Amino acid sequence: GAITARMQGEEKLDFDLLTRTLQFRPGDRYDQSRLIATKRRLDATGVFSFTAIDAQIPDSSDVRLSHVLNLQTRVRHQIRFETFMQQRSGALADTENELGAGLGVTYSNVNLFGGGESFRIRSTGSLAADIGGFGGFTSAQWESSASLSYPYLTFPFGRLDRFSRLYDARSQVSLSLLAARRDALKLTLRGRGGARYRFELRH
């Protein structure tokens, strides 16, 4: 047997993404549990909004049972804006009564390179002021984070992904940066950064 694919209205989808999620190969004995595992793996990639595996009725003389995978991809690009307010008082605030407001934006791409890679970047900024003593702005904060997630295990665990029946597998690289100014605490600038490489798998 062979694996073929036909795409309509989708210009950026790597065929390797489909073959990587298959839990069976042409010529294998029929096993419904492997079909179910394949559908779960396709759903777990986050690329598709609809997945279905349908069996084709074979000829009476044909011992093979062909299957068709019907997939519908999600909208690739998403942008979200957010606003928020916060109020602090007592030991956690720079003044007796501090009120702050902020703005944030998030961009997401569920299929960055065509292989199911999920990219997300988020940035927020906020300002706080003394509303009790009318002392003006008391603090400012800026935070940004970015992550890139693969729907499979990368080096050095890629072989484990290929030779085991995992319900879901994911590798993620993430970065975060934070900078803040606190006038009342005599801190003119505070910065913090972090990086993380994480593997997730479910059997």
Question: In which residue ranges do the predicted regions lie?
Answer:
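Gram-negative/organellar outer-membrane beta-barrel architecture
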Residues: E11-K12, D31-H203
